[in-house]
């Protein structure tokens, strides 16, 4: 069936399926520069819905939007040694402008900790200036060697939050608060189950004291880091001399955080829920929640379209995102296929016989059709969209549970990471972690916050566990 509809089956080649569905569902296309993509209106509408949800949650927690320059002096990046070392291989650098060589090369923003740190050093003087709670919506450039649409691109859209606090306690509370917002976005809006946890020293953000993350499992058994929140301690404050006078007139360094989520979240939605017929979009983020496909011949066209338009208005009055596909140049069958490919949760089929009987056919993207009274649809569909979300989440959670294994031997570990998450003990040594990656291509995803305390011995080297609980390992995007 997938072949007939022009998609490679997931079981045959998941990577090829992913690339095909992005193009055929008109989410994105390849840009003229290697590693760049053009996000088409349907794909951008998903990003806008993600933005709206996050922006509301950020503002509810006291954050304000701001914008900082795209060009950053290279000297800024060099001020934080770990930071520049971590980003150097991915930097795009401007050396000439206006036909002349620049006095100082400028990095094209890979992330904004440095330029925001510089500005805070000018703005923050007293405890009264704290906390600083900022968010920036924008683009960043990281010159990735191996690119894949939405997951790794040379330029991508994201939000990056940056906050400064008087105490470590306040900053750490912020780190967890923002991670929980990302987890809410995943679970409550994208229907994606995620594991919240701590990154290992090897996997943490360059320049952070520690990094927290939400990790999701894709249908091919690979993990995807869907959002991160970092405690930066005084690292950037010391590098940029961001000091304040506290209530006792003591001069101290601020404690900073940063946190970000990019359009790779769209990739997570595609790979968590999609099937051989195309996308399956979670209703709360879908650009179109209900598509109405009128079915008519010339003599019934006007009557059917009038009823379809009335239904659209009634559904929109309930706050639903509705599209009426009244194109004459395509058959109903073509339209059914197109909207299945694009992952619209519900399709309403409305023909002259349906009108005579005062009913319509409702088809779910999760499978199954039912006939309902036309007048009942505006009341029924909001609840059906909730049930659709819950079923989508249930299926994704069941998949994750079926592809998560506790392992205690390296042989069992190697088998487990071929299929999904392996829960294993680890010694915490970076060299041991690197060897595991070289030998299996699996990496540590996180030390889960919710995992039960448990003692054991490293799955590879046999030394005692460093974390007092099992670590999540997987192959990853």
Curated annotation (Swiss-Prot):
Which keywords does the record carry?
Answer: Aminoacyl-tRNA synthetase, ATP-binding, Cytoplasm, Ligase, Nucleotide-binding, Protein biosynthesis
**Membrane-spanning parts:** none
Where would you find this protein in the cell?
Answer: Cytoplasm
Per the record, GO CC terms?
aminoacyl-tRNA synthetase multienzyme complex; cytoplasm
Please list the GO biological process terms of this entry.
prolyl-tRNA aminoacylation
Question: Which reaction is the catalytic activity of this chain?
Answer: tRNA(Pro) + L-proline + ATP = L-prolyl-tRNA(Pro) + AMP + diphosphate
MF terms from GO for this chain are: ATP binding; proline-tRNA ligase activity
| Assigned EC number | 6.1.1.15
Quaternary organization: Homodimer.
Q: What does this protein do?
A: Catalyzes the attachment of proline to tRNA(Pro) in a two-step reaction: proline is first activated by ATP to form Pro-AMP and then transferred to the acceptor end of tRNA(Pro).
Name the family the entry cites.
Belongs to the class-II aminoacyl-tRNA synthetase family. ProS type 3 subfamily.
Q: Domain remarks in the entry?
A: Consists of three domains: the N-terminal catalytic domain, the anticodon-binding domain and the C-terminal extension.
Question: Could you identify this protein by its name?
Answer: Proline--tRNA ligase
